[in-house]
A protein has these predicted regions:
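Short, well-structured beta-strand-loop connectors
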Residues: 2-15
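Short glycine/proline-centered loop/turn elements that form peptide/ligand docking sites
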Residues: 2, 18-25
Length: 270
């Protein structure tokens, strides 16, 4: 990189070196609003980065690293990226093994509307699962349709997925309170919302294992949804999520000793 060059995202700015006065290589950088020497430094957060601690890896989003933090950019795993980088026109077909031995087939399609909102459409249940994505992750924004549908379970399973694989790393987030709550509880929460939130629906996804070889690649993940009222866990959903050969191969839903197994019976069609 030379003075005056135009930069784009992903360009290498510098290599980490040693000035001779430091015991280890390091790099200094700052953000400023104007290109002039001596301009004020902006106190600005970084989008997504990985914090490496003694306990393992931790995703940080829109935060600022602390002194002595060991950080790295998110290293994209192509298997995860291709599986969760949904493209309009892409189609999926899942066979769901339901409690009681029944089996049903569901066809989904990725759609973009005239406002460029992207969502997964289920023809059988007339349900929509809206999503957004950036260079580092895919995340669902909201669901419209039947809450007992396979698409809704997929919403709960893969609410937020980072494209990078870091073993045992956990992603944590929360759903809107009306996702799995209704009736009097929602009315009461709306009334006291300015003071405190006693309803919480927590989401957690954990990266379990990864296998790579010349002909195949696979990644296993587990996720959980925990509905809490006043700090007490009232209901839990447990999920597994399997990625094979760059596509979502299978996901399972366990709730109240009932298990739903959804198997992708064809690779995504473009």
């Amino acid at each position: 990189m030379q003075k005056g060059d135009t930069l784009k995202k992903g360009d290498i700015l510098a290599h980490c070196g040693n000035s001779g006065r430091s015991p280890q290589p390091h790099i200094h950088f700052q953000l400023q609003a104007t290109p002039f020497i001596g301009s004020k430094t902006l106190d600005y957060p970084l989008g997504h980065y990985i914090l490496n601690t003694d306990k393992g890896y931790e995703l940080k989003s829109f935060e600022k690293p602390e002194k002595d933090d060991k950080v790295t950019a998110v290293e994209k795993n192509q298997t995860l990226y291709k599986a969760f980088h949904f493209i309009p026109g892409q189609q999926f077909e899942f066979e769901a093994a339901l409690p009681g031995g029944q089996k049903k087939t569901y066809k989904w399609e990725v759609v973009a509307d005239i406002y460029n909102n992207t969502y997964i459409w289920c023809e059988a249940t007339h349900s929509k699962l809206f999503f957004k994505s950036d260079d580092d992750m895919m995340y669902f924004t909201h669901f419209e349709g039947k809450r007992r549908s396979l698409l809704f379970y997929f919403y709960l399973t893969a609410y937020k997925v980072l494209y990078g694989y870091y073993k045992d790393m956990e992603l944590k987030d929360s759903f809107p309170v009306n996702t799995l709550n209704s009736g009097l509880l929602i009315l009461l929460q709306d009334f006291v919302a300015p003071f405190f939130m006693f309803l919480k629906t927590n989401y957690q996804l954990k990266y379990i294992s990864k296998k790579d070889d010349f002909t195949d690649s696979s990644i296993e993940m587990q996720s959980q949804v925990d509905i809490r009222v006043g700090g007490i866990s009232m209901k839990k959903y447990n999920f597994t999520l399997s990625v094979r050969k760059d596509h979502i191969a299978e996901f399972t839903v366990t709730h109240k000793n009932k298990i739903v197994v959804a198997t992708n019976i064809n690779k995504p069609l473009s």
